[in-house]
């Protein structure tokens, strides 16, 4: 069985209770990317977009690794600095087109099919249509995470998210086995014969389908990845058929995405039915109605970076992946079940009169929308926090410390073991500094997350400090000041009156003119003692 990528025609062109970050962020200004105005899918719900600017109130996906399982990617300025080491899982060297089979190079060498290839059946008897290279993976990746506010091109939905490119589609398709292996590796599962993935993905975007049931091996991969908290976002296919006929969209536990047009209705090509969870902008097969994203100028092999439009459920899925990356950047520990509860309860309704609105279940529960999702996150109940702790504690002293979250005892964790110890509900000061205890709790569908911190100041012991000088000091005479202290810090002796006296590099004091010589000795703070300084005066005479 051969997997088919969704390849439409592309057109060139103290106690601190930290609130949920979703509860306080402001709506950002539009980005300065020159093609942003042409990205209709990023506009507000009023024009059937995802509302990018409201999505960015969550953040822009920083730290949330997004794997794109696709044709690989080409070098593009919109990805600079955020491409992680990926992998090429195409086992068929001929189909891979890069000289070998599986390897650590996930770049896209092009997937064109020529007349000669068809005549010679280079890629098998089922490959019967000529095509230029699709640059499909590059386009999908750009929708998710193209850089924003860099003054060029387009803006991605999660422009700070790291990109994990994983190549599974070559000339005229790919294999289900390669796809399953790629899914497992991308999410951090072990795979014999393949190096361990050092940067597992939190979100896996799969913009490809194969017409078949979800195999036991594929379902097992989805189950294991879901258990690790990996979100698998899949396109539902472009055949205008029941989506339940296509894997991996028919695997239980994937988030399946159908396509809508600028009018907010089901795109004519989009698969449909009960296997569709939600919809997102996928565009119509026209330049003005398509999805504008990153592309490449080459018709066969890659040449220069470019931008182009495409349409398909392949283009819809990455809008959902980008929104989820933004959400999980704000709340990485949010249980995925709560994430989906909030997501499905806050989809934008399909426009009145559309086929999706008239036939419930045809296109999923609604259109994914960042504004509605953000509002739901921000409206969650803030937890009630209480605490009992001293504000200051002397070295060697102990005191009870406790905290509650919504009336239940909070499990406090010590984060500064060199400053204090914590056991049995009591903290003991060890050294000067800030003693910090912390309690965290993930958010849920109804309650904001907790990040409670208790800070106790531990001052150092006040050291004794004296500086012995003679009553008078003759001009040009040199003496060594005598410093006495109980501190284990190293004292520094300096002159406060350099026109009257100076302290040399060897620590000796010398009077250079008549007058009052002021000498300062300073001690730094140490683990046991506080900082201290004193100034002593001596009369310099001739």
Where do the protein language model's features map onto the residues?
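Acidic glycine-/aspartate-rich tracts in secreted/extracellular proteins
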Residues: 71-75, 79, 148-150, 169-172, ...
């Amino acid at each position: 069985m051969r997997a088919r990528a969704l390849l439409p025609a592309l057109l060139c062109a103290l106690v601190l209770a930290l609130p949920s970050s979703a509860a306080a962020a402001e709506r950002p200004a539009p980005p300065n990317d020159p093609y942003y105005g042409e990205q209709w899918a990023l506009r507000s719900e009023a024009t059937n977009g995802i509302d990018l600017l409201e999505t960015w109130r969550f953040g822009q996906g920083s730290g949330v690794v997004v794997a794109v399982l696709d044709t690989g990617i080409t070098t593009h300025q919109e990805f600079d600095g955020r491409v992680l080491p990926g992998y090429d899982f195409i086992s068929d060297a001929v189909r891979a087109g890069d000289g070998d089979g599986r390897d650590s190079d996930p770049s896209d060498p092009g997937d064109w099919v020529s007349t000669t290839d068809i005549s010679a059946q280079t890629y098998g008897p089922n490959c019967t249509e000529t095509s230029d290279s699709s640059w499909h993976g590059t386009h999908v990746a750009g929708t998710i995470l193209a850089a924003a506010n860099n003054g060029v091109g387009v803006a991605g939905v999660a422009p700070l998210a790291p990109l994990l490119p994983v190549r599974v589609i070559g000339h005229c398709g790919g294999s289900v086995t390669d796809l399953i292996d790629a899914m497992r590796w991308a999410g951090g599962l072990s795979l014999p014969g393949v190096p361990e993935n050092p940067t597992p993905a939190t979100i896996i975007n799969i913009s490809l389908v194969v017409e078949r049931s979800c195999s036991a091996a594929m379902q097992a991969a989805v189950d294991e990845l879901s258990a690790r908290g990996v979100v698998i976002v899949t396109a539902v296919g472009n055949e205008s058929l029941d989506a339940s006929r296509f894997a991996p969209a028919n695997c239980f536990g994937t988030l399946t995405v159908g396509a809508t047009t600028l009018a907010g209705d089901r795109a004519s090509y989009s698969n449909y039915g009960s296997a569709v969870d939600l919809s997102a902008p996928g565009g119509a097969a026209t330049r003005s109605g398509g999805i504008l994203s990153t592309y490449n100028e080459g018709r066969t092999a890659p040449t220069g970076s470019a931008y182009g439009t495409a349409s398909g459920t392949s283009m819809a899925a990455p809008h959902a992946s980008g929104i989820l990356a933004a959400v999980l950047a704000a709340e990485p520990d949010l249980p995925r079940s709560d994430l989906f509860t909030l997501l499905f309860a806050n989809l934008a309704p399909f426009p009145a009169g559309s086929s999706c609105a008239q036939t419930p279940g045809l296109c999923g529960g609604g259109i994914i929308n960042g504004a509605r999702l953000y509002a739901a996150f921000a409206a969650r109940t803030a937890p009630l926090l209480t605490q009992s702790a001293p504000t200051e504690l002397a070295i060697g002293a102990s005191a009870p410390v406790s905290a509650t979250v919504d009336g239940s005892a909070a499990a406090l964790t010590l984060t500064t073991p060199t400053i204090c110890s914590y056991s049995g509900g009591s903290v003991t000061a060890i050294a000067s500094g800030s003693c910090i205890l912390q309690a965290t709790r993930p958010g849920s569908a109804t309650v904001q997350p907790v990040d409670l911190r208790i800070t106790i100041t531990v001052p150092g012991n006040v050291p004794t400090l004296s500086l012995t000088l003679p009553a008078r000091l003759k001009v040009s005479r040199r003496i060594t000041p005598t410093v006495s202290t109980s501190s284990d810090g190293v004292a520094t002796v300096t002159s406060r009156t350099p026109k009257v006296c100076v302290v040399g590099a060897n620590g000796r004091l010398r009077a250079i003119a008549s007058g009052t010589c002021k000498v300062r000795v300073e001690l730094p703070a140490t683990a046991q003692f506080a900082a201290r300084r004193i100034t002593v005066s001596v009369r310099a005479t001739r």
